[in-house]
Amino acid sequence: MTTSKPHEENLSPLSYRAAGVDIDAGERLVENIRPYAKRTLRPEVLAGIGGFGALFEISRKFNNPVLVAGTDGVGTKLKLAFESGRHDTVGIDLVAMSVNDILVQGAEPLFFLDYFACGKLDVDTATLVVKGIAAGCEQAGCALIGGETAEMPGMYPEGEYDLAGFAVGAVEKDRIITGTTIKAGDAVLGLASSGAHSNGYSLIRKIIEKNNVDLSADFHGRALIDVIMAPTRIYVKPLLELMRQVPVKGMAHITGGGLLENIPRILPEGVTAVLKKETWEMPPLFAWLQREGNVADNEMHRVFNCGIGMAVVVAPEYIDAAAQLLQSKGEIAWRIGTIREQRADEPRTILE
């Protein structure tokens, strides 16, 4: 009986790098991002980037804190980042989607963690992404205390990656905002968005593809790609200040589903929000998308924010003070509607 000799190439030693995972690249990334993460640190951070787990001490300024957690991604906006080579702002989008979500319950964002997954780690690209994440954390006032970089050969096409983010905040138990006190007669304030934010990009990409759009073309004085890729606005600092000075009854982060599906999430039974479309300025991007895609009006308001990134409900006597405060903090705010008693068989939010 004879046995075949092993092929000569099978005698060559294998390594993790040969299998597609570069540990050294991962370590270079950690060193690259460390100074960006350091800029986001808060006094409560006891241990951050580089350890097995991050440590965060709850501040004594809270008497009876409730932790509020949120997680989200950036969606198919990433596809446009890959195609355009613009990786520096999607990290801001990632932070915005989670911190704006937990903010609506009254929470101050405390810390943030990210998950970056790819088939082959490009250190320069990943550094740009995490630099954006750190910039978003600075805007939100929360600490970037950790994350995970997963290099998984064969899982993603070359040059592509996916992102997920996780935000944790805190709110005093007796100051949680639930929307339960909203009643007929209350006013709805809308805060301007910076663009499409991070929702509706599958439709945006379809419109671009169908019309063979030149993304470098001028669009109201800017390259169209710059307008489409504008990062999601982070509303944390102005709205935390608003909550300190004005009794806020409810807030809705206008994401997927638009005004029509997000405002009902904060309304108690028996009331409807009536919004007037002429009360705010819809950015040119949305008119362009509607025209180029032949998108129905109702569909536009179910997919996109259409110019309103956050809705705030206050009693009518506070509407002027709230608008003035927000405008003093750099926000554009309009009174966009009113709460009324719900009529038979009508939806929870109406656009007129």
Curated annotation (Swiss-Prot):
Gene Ontology cellular-component terms listed: cytosol
InterPro entries: PurM-like_C_dom, PurM-like_C_sf, PurM-like_N, PurM-like_N_sf, PurM_cligase
Annotated compartments: Cytoplasm
Gene3D superfamilies: PurM-like C-terminal domain, PurM-like, N-terminal domain
Gene Ontology terms: biological process: 'de novo' IMP biosynthetic process; adenine biosynthetic process
Catalytic activity annotation: 2-formamido-N(1)-(5-O-phospho-beta-D-ribosyl)acetamidine + ATP = 5-amino-1-(5-phospho-beta-D-ribosyl)imidazole + ADP + phosphate + H(+)
Pathway membership, UniProt: Purine metabolism; IMP biosynthesis via de novo pathway; 5-amino-1-(5-phospho-D-ribosyl)imidazole from N(2)-formyl-N(1)-(5-phospho-D-ribosyl)glycinamide: step 2/2
E.C. numbers: 6.3.3.1
A single MF term (Gene Ontology): phosphoribosylformylglycinamidine cyclo-ligase activity
Keywords recorded for this protein, A-Z: ATP-binding, Cytoplasm, Ligase, Nucleotide-binding, Purine biosynthesis
Main subcellular location: cytoplasm
Family affiliation: Belongs to the AIR synthase family.
UniProt name for this protein: Phosphoribosylformylglycinamidine cyclo-ligase
Source organism: Nitrosospira multiformis (strain ATCC 25196 / NCIMB 11849 / C 71)
Encoding gene (name): purM
